[in-house]
Amino acid sequence: MELVMKDAKSALEVSETTFGREFNEALVHQVVVAYAAGARQGTRAQLTRSEVSGGGKKPWRQKGTGRARAGSIRSPIWRSGGVTFAAKPQDHSQKVNKKMYRGAIRSILSELVRQERLIVVEKFGIEAPKTKELIAKLKEMELTDVLIVTAEVDENLFLAARNLYKVDVRDVAGIDPVSLIAFDKVLMTADAVKQIEEMLA
């Protein structure tokens, strides 16, 4: 299959297995959920009654005071007591094997092509790390909400886009399922497309 390049009259020959797949919604959902879960810190921590300091001595005797019996001032029903079902640090990551991950990326790329949300250009860059310059270039292409994917890390593009809302710059190694579906359009250089094909082959 061929992808028409926006800044050139020629078309780029690409693999059907990478850019012409049927959309597998269940697989994409599973991989995106797993990816987002893996990004969670899971560092919350509360103290149970055994972990709160103090509470070793019985506050008053068992019988004869007329008060409710109490064994510790750190009981969860007491002020400053422990938490009944205390939250503990947790690993939220889910296992996703390579085949599934690559399959999801292929599925997303194919759907982007079908929805005409993938734009391929011969080259894309700016001369200096100026946000104004990047905005002008994107305006020219009528792009506002876009992920820019280059073959190598482009320092000028990265610095220029750093302060822009709804614009992100990644190299091929930095793309993931979440970033590919988070933006309205995905702008890729021809070299990046070839590199992705090699990576997913």
Swiss-Prot record:
Keywords: Ribonucleoprotein, Ribosomal protein, RNA-binding, rRNA-binding. One of its GO terms (molecular function) is rRNA binding. Transmembrane segments: none annotated. GO terms for biological process: translation. SUPFAM superfamilies: Ribosomal protein L4. Residues 45-66 are annotated as: Disordered. One of its GO terms (cellular component) is ribosome. The keyword Ribosomal protein applies. InterPro entries: Ribosomal_uL4, Ribosomal_uL4-like, Ribosomal_uL4_dom_sf. One of the primary rRNA binding proteins, this protein initially binds near the 5'-end of the 23S rRNA. It is important during the early stages of 50S assembly. It makes multiple contacts with different domains of the 23S rRNA in the assembled 50S subunit and ribosome. Forms part of the polypeptide exit tunnel. Belongs to the universal ribosomal protein uL4 family. PANTHER family: 50S RIBOSOMAL PROTEIN L4, LARGE RIBOSOMAL SUBUNIT PROTEIN UL4M. Part of the 50S ribosomal subunit. This is Large ribosomal subunit protein uL4.
